[in-house]
Amino acid sequence: MTRDVQKPVSTKDFLKDVFICSLGAYGGPEAHYGVFTDQLIRKKQYLTEEDLIELIALTQLLPGPSSTQTLVAIGYKMGGPKLALLTMLVWSLPVIVVMILLSFLSELLGVFHLREDGLRYIGPMAVGFIILAAYRIGTKVVKDSFTLGLLIFGAVGTFFIRASWIYPAVLFTGGLLAVARSKEKDIWHRVKLDPPYKYLFFFGFFALGGLLFSAFFDHVLIDLFESFYRYGYLVIGGGQVVIPLMYTELVEIQNYMSSQDFLTGFGLVQGLPGPMFSFSAYAGAMAAKG
């Protein structure tokens, strides 16, 4: 990294740049990376593009919102846990608040025909952001025939196999092939890991506690907490992957909302900047209303 926790940046300036990213981040995580590159690397040089690519690869292996995790990791590198938390709030809180408010204004949106007519041009714009981000990242990582082969392998695998497990499987396979091909010595013994196991304890406590409370107590808020927490720790691939799962549970199984209300919220989040997972705020508010 170009900067680290020992040499923190100005909290105010960094959070201002994060807020600028949140205002221009349309189109899901793939497009978000292009925004991060422009604002945090090209303009402010908080880190290098190679550093960003490494963080993206790491977060792709983890469940949950990948672009949010990437940005929070950058915040942690710049200023430690406090700045990481503030980064997450500045990045996600504005659009989450907007989505919650819109869940209570769905009838008004229908009157003004914003369900479909006002949002039909957002999709093509988002595709443009995604193509630009893919090109910029591709020029940095595809350097020879081997990396080109990995790119084709990943693209073909994820295109034909539509399952959440394919993403970490492709990344693990590519990583193993790269390590096996590498001529570096003792590559497995260079990094000493000392993970904070207390965080794993809290994660397991809430995961198991949510399942138990949901099984023994029939309350909509408990069920919603368990469902959304489970989405966060099981779903790999970002907001686009979790949407079908949410639709099945919230609309078809639990009947917390209508299909039209669900699709309206999905259309709205496509037209707003910020993380795709903010759709969970809309869906949760709609479900809580009953």
Regions found by a protein language model. Give the residues of each.
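Multi-pass membrane proteins that catalyze or facilitate reactions on polyprenyl-/lipid-phosphate substrates
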Residues: 1-62, 73-290
